[in-house]
Amino acid sequence: MAVISMKQLLEAGVHFGHQTRRWNPKMAKYIFTERNGIYIIDLQKTVKKVDEAYNFVRELAAEGGNVLFVGTKKQAQDTIKEEAIRSGMFFINERWLGGTLTNFSTIKKRINRLKQLEKMEEDGTFEVLPKKEVIILKKEMTRLEKFLGGIKDMPGVPDALFIVDPRKERIAIAEAHKLNIPIVAIVDTNCDPDEIDYVIPANDDAIRAVKLLTSKMADAIIEAKQGEEEVAEEAVATEAEATEAE
């Protein structure tokens, strides 16, 4: 059975592409027709592609891999954060900082600085410092949290990226390519699908469409993790039974 139904996709407006004058010819194979100057995406292909992406993400998560959710456009920001947190993964929903992947050691230093400031706030250090200094430090902490909060617990470079709108996230894609990190992405009719390993042809501007598809990728991770938990529970139960038998 498919991970997602045609009905769900239609209701979320996943089929609406961009205006016909704003298109990438490489997306032609994913286009069903044109209506009132707008391309209509072939949802049968979207269903198939969601299945492929879901299976890839689930298998990656089952092997302990990390997925970085990326969506800095307004329509994606909230969903990217919510679904990454729900699935226990990491996210970037503000500006992508150059070198986030290719220069992770430098980014890690900034993350350590953020954690240091958070600790200072928690342990009461701010209370004994001059007010002016505290204001400056809090400003720095807020800024670091804004850009790095979603990756501050990420142990290293992620094993895959999930991206909303490849045109918007060109730097992230270029960095992932340099490091051979696979990319899953919601790809609209104005994007280049050749840059993406797992293309999900869909409307990347409608909040409902972005929410539906992003939540499915989060579901794949959760399903994999639940499977791990069940395997661990079974192992504990088997061990207990073996001990009793002795």
UniProtKB/Swiss-Prot annotation:
The gene is rpsB. InterPro entries: Ribosomal_uS2 (IPR001865), Ribosomal_uS2_bac/mit/plastid (IPR005706), Ribosomal_uS2_CS (IPR018130), Ribosomal_uS2_flav_dom_sf (IPR023591). This is Small ribosomal subunit protein uS2. Belongs to the universal ribosomal protein uS2 family. Keywords: Ribonucleoprotein, Ribosomal protein. The keyword Ribonucleoprotein applies. One of its GO terms (biological process) is translation. NCBIfam families: rpsB_bact (TIGR01011). One of its GO terms (molecular function) is structural constituent of ribosome. It comes from the Bacteria. Pfam families: Ribosomal_S2 (PF00318). GO terms for cellular component: cytosolic small ribosomal subunit. The keyword Ribosomal protein applies.
